[in-house]
């Protein structure tokens, strides 16, 4: 079974403030929201967390990117840039070593299924600064009534191994973030940096 998630938003069940505050942004970083969907994380980042920063909102879904471009124009934002791109093929508008934080929410599991992890990780390594961070937030691989099929979810331990194979080390892990599901939360957030 192929899992498609293009254009879906996590805004209804994940709090952008909880997520962004966990990233400890200073306010002047360059931030890339990979697979941004409707851009709710990007919009909140510019509004509250990166007043002197720059945000690239990247998605392969044209409708999402066009909606974001309209939002940018309506609000005269020059530090939010919407880019239509397939991360596996490269984000050509973003220079090598220019991003402080790459953030990906509920997207990496799709590359587990499509076997394009290597392309994604190498692109992230290309665009982050030498001290840059890659933050991945994903559904925990546990049964819940929503989210991707459990067989394509990926654990934080799996991610740590995968990213480690590419010379990236885990520097932060929060296993208690997202929507309440019983005695735990729906997601985890893991951050990697170059070794």
Named regions from a protein language model:
Residues 32, 37-90:
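Class I SAM-dependent methyltransferase SAM/SAH-binding core
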Residues 92-102:
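A short acidic, Gly/Pro-enriched loop at the edge of an enzyme's catalytic core
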Residues 100-115:
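A short SAM/SAH-binding and catalytic strip from SAM-dependent methyltransferases
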Residues 118-130:
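A short glycine-rich, Lys/Arg-flanked "PGG" loop and its adjoining helix->strand segment in the class I
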Residues 147-166:
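Conserved Class I S-adenosyl-L-methionine
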